[in-house]
């Protein structure tokens, strides 16, 4: 059991660190390369914007004394919860999901700590209908959540095992 916990922890950490590094590298490249609109496909553009809020720009209008502590504390809590959940779940898919979420949280936390806002540069759209801009960290968090939902949707005993382990 202890060996498996160690493997789960390493899986989580390796994915979280990989996502974090990929996110920071792509954001730094975006700052250098995407100062103007770059159309990759008719539905995909790259250009840099700065987001003071969270997903979809939510909370960006809050005053800094409220917004900044909230947006700095939340990812730290997410990192702790995702690591512990991955560690004690006893499941590789959960560890991968939590690593994606944790790495994404860390990438956006880095931006908030050092820039006061998050760098977004990926823009998807169909015609004039745009999805809000995002980055690798945001995509990683979304994929991690989707993977976790799919896992529990298709394997109900997994949730029962997790509850039994915590008792």
UniProtKB/Swiss-Prot annotation:
Role, per record: This protein specifically catalyzes the removal of signal peptides from prolipoproteins.
Entry keyword set: Aspartyl protease, Cell inner membrane, Cell membrane, Hydrolase, Membrane, Protease, Transmembrane, Transmembrane helix
Biological processes annotated in GO: proteolysis
Protein name: Lipoprotein signal peptidase
Enzyme Commission code(s) on record: 3.4.23.36
Molecular function, one GO term: aspartic-type endopeptidase activity
PANTHER family documented for this protein: LIPOPROTEIN SIGNAL PEPTIDASE
């Amino acid at each position: 059991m202890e060996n498996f916990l160690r493997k789960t922890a390493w899986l989580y950490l390796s994915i979280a660190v990989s996502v974090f590094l990929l996110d920071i590298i792509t954001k730094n490249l975006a700052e250098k390369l995407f100062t103007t609109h770059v159309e990759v496909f008719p539905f995909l553009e790259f250009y840099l914007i700065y987001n003071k809020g969270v997903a979809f720009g939510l909370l960006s209008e809050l005053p800094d004394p409220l917004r900044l502590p909230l947006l700095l504390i939340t990812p730290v809590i997410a990192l702790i919860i995702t690591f512990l959940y991955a560690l004690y779940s006893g499941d590789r898919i959960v560890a991968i999901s939590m690593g994606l979420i944790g790495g994404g949280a860390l990438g956006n936390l880095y931006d908030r700590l050092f820039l006061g806002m998050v760098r977004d540069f990926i823009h998807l759209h169909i015609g004039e209908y745009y999805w809000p801009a995002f980055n690798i960290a945001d995509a990683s968090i979304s994929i991690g959540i989707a993977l976790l939902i799919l896992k529990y949707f298709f394997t109900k005993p997994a949730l029962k095992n997790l509850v039994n382990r915590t008792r």
